[in-house]
């Protein structure tokens, strides 16, 4: 029987000092035998997805202590990718994931906590906490802050839905007046919560449901809705039960590595492909799998992408559909239910709240008629500007159960039988590249264009806004990978500006950087190996022909092998300046340290620990 970890600091005469300090936090004599549950919160006033989380830790703590646990809360950092976008701040976004993972590990292990509730929401916070949970392998429940309500703007006879991306596209469109642009800006993000489309934050919060580590509704129930209160309370009660099952009953099935197995990771990726989630999820799932020693790799994603249909299109792939609409259609259990009926998921995997995913779907898939499930998924937007959680209790009169023409389709009526994400290979991406096919027009699934090469996102943006990019061009942005950036910046501004210039359907953009979950169009990222590691993208020249064939999963530079060999020889002859960008960029010591340790996007951009010699015994 495993001993409670916390007893290292709460039992024994030699721990008198530790107990004295615990008492100073409010613990009493009767508390020292109870499980100590860490609450990893991520409240910050910088991020709308986290601005309402200040009191969520106390709410979870009340539920933990009500059922006999001791709750101890701490906070992690949280970077807002939208605010950090388009300038040097974006260099810090992906590296912050590793800091978050480390900070959770440090706090939990330093204080010998028995289990964790992870209160996350936005882009790198959920992945960082997921990585830490897979490392620690103690009971965990995830509960997110929830998605933002979609923005709304009234037009002639119609109300149009908006999100963050609309404000960016409008601002760069010279045909949009200043007053109209300002109106869109003021309307795009009306409430607290993670941005309202199927962007990275919401994609990851949905995937925790598929991994079995969060409760139904975690990814889709709005941040503003009063029903979300019960989600936090349930997480608090559930974690104490899981802790007792592990430490008192030796039930290892409740541990993250028993729940988030290879089969569960396949389920999560299958969900991601079906709902056209953010390409960043590929990066984060690979990283989490690696932390948990799960045998799940890029070739598995490629295999799944070839057989999973695109069942759901959400902004940015479909501008009038947002997370509130996905919720009305039954949320993640409904999507998983359709995938189950298509024979595409493993339903015998455990979850934190049901013996198996199959058992969970019997109750929570709205097509099965459960009243509690119907009540949960009727939670609707309040349409009132607010930064407060639980501020409204609006409900839809009826659910969206139309699986032929609704927000969520069954396999027979899928948006496409080819999924929403694809892995491309070829001489430009020997280790793979990622494209969100759900956001690509059918007319450009195959595309041949002329390379326009840039060694920074800033230069590419200047060319697009300066009308130097034309139909048929392939914008190549290199030296923006994990090492080359460093930090693998998101390319939301270039893709948004291509849209605003009317080039979104007649140009492509390829990069060793990555894309925001808000990006759409023929945008191919995560090219591996990256330029800074000798990838062929570093040898592309202006005027080269680039061939993209998504149906056949290829990405090819149409230059002869002999010419490529000559270019590589000339590059290597540069000595210390070889495989380095021709640009001015100040890179801090912290980012230099990240660059020195990181791996390629094909491995999740995690740290290469083989560089470190670890002494297991001293």
From Swiss-Prot:
The keyword Iron-sulfur applies. Mg(2+) binds at residues 81, 123-124, 490. Binds 1 [2Fe-2S] cluster per subunit. This cluster acts as a Lewis acid cofactor. [2Fe-2S] cluster binds at residues 122, 195. One of its GO terms (molecular function) is dihydroxy-acid dehydratase activity. Its EC number is 4.2.1.9. The active site is at residue 516. Functions in the biosynthesis of branched-chain amino acids. Catalyzes the dehydration of (2R,3R)-2,3-dihydroxy-3-methylpentanoate (2,3-dihydroxy-3-methylvalerate) into 2-oxo-3-methylpentanoate (2-oxo-3-methylvalerate) and of (2R)-2,3-dihydroxy-3-methylbutanoate (2,3-dihydroxyisovalerate) into 2-oxo-3-methylbutanoate (2-oxoisovalerate), the penultimate precursor to L-isoleucine and L-valine, respectively. NCBIfam families: ilvD, PRK12448.1. Homodimer. This is Dihydroxy-acid dehydratase. It comes from Gluconobacter oxydans (strain 621H) (Gluconobacter suboxydans).
């Amino acid at each position: 029987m495993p001993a409670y970890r916390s007893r290292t600091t709460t039992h024994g005469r030699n721990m008198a000092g530790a107990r004295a300090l615990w008492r100073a936090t409010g613990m009493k004599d009767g508390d020292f035998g109870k499980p100590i549950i860490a609450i990893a919160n991520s409240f910050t006033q910088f991020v709308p997805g986290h601005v309402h989380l200040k009191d969520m830790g106390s709410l979870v703590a009340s539920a933990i202590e009500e059922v006999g646990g001791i709750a101890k809360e701490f906070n992690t950092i949280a970077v807002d990718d939208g605010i950090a976008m388009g300038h040097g701040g974006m260099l810090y976004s992906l590296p912050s994931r590793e800091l978050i993972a480390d900070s959770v590990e440090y706090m939990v292990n330093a204080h010998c906590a028995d289990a964790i509730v992870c209160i996350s929401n936005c882009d790198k916070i959920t992945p960082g906490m997921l990585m830490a949970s897979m490392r620690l392998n103690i009971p965990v429940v995830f509960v997110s802050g929830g998605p933002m309500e979609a923005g709304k703007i009234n037009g002639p006879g119609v109300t149009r839905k908006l999100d963050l991306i609309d404000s960016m596209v409008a601002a760069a469109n010279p045909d949009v007046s200043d007053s109209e642009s300002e109106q869109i800006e003021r309307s795009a993000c009306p409430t607290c919560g993670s941005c309202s489309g199927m962007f990275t934050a919401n994609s990851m919060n949905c995937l925790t449901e598929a991994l079995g580590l969060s409760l139904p509704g975690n990814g889709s129930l709005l941040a503003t809705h009063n029903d979300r209160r019960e989600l936090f309370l349930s997480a608090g009660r559930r974690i104490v039960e899981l802790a007792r099952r592990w430490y008192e009953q030796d039930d290892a099935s409740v541990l993250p590595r028993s729940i988030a197995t290879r089969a569960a990771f396949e389920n999560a990726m299958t969900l991601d492909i079906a709902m056209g989630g953010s390409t960043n999820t590929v990066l984060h799932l690979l990283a989490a799998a690696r932390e948990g020693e799960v045998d799940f790799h890029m070739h598995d994603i490629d295999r799944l992408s070839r057989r999973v249909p695109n069942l759901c299109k959400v902004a940015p792939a479909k501008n009038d559909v947002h997370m509130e609409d996905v919720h009305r259609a039954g949320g993640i259990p409904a999507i998983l239910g359709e995938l189950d009926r298509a024979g595409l998921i493993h339903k015998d995997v455990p979850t934190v709240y049901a013996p198996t995913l199959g058992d969970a779907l019997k109750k929570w898939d709205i097509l099965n008629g459960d009243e509690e499930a119907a009540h949960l998924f009727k939670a609707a937007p309040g349409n009132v500007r607010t930064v407060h959680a639980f501020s409204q209790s609006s409900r839809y009169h009826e659910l969206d159960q139309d699986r032929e023409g609704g927000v969520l389709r069954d396999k027979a009526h899928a948006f496409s039988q080819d999924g929403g994400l694809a892995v491309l290979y070829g001489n430009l991406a020997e280790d793979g590249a990622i494209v969100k096919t759900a956001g690509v027009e059918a007319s450009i699934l195959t595309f041949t264009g002329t390379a326009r090469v840039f060694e920074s996102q800033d230069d590419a943006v200047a060319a697009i806004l300066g009308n130097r990019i034309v139909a048929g061009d392939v914008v190549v942005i290199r030296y923006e990978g994990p090492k080359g950036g460093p930090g693998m910046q998101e390319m939301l501004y270039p893709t948004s500006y291509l849209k605003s210039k009317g080039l979104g359907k007649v140009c492509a953009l390829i990069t060793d950087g990555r894309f925001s979950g808000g990006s759409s169009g023929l945008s191919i990222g995560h090219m591996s190996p990256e330029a800074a590691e000798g990838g062929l993208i570093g040898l592309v020249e202006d005027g080269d022909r680039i061939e993209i064939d998504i149906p056949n999963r290829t990405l090819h530079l149409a230059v002869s092998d002999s010419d490529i060999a000559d270019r590589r020889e000339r590059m290597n002859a540069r000595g210390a300046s070889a495989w380095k960008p021709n640009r001015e960029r100040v890179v801090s010591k912290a980012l230099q340290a990240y660059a020195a340790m990181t791996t390629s996007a094909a491995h999740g951009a995690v740290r290469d620990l083989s560089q470190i010699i670890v002494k297991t015994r001293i």
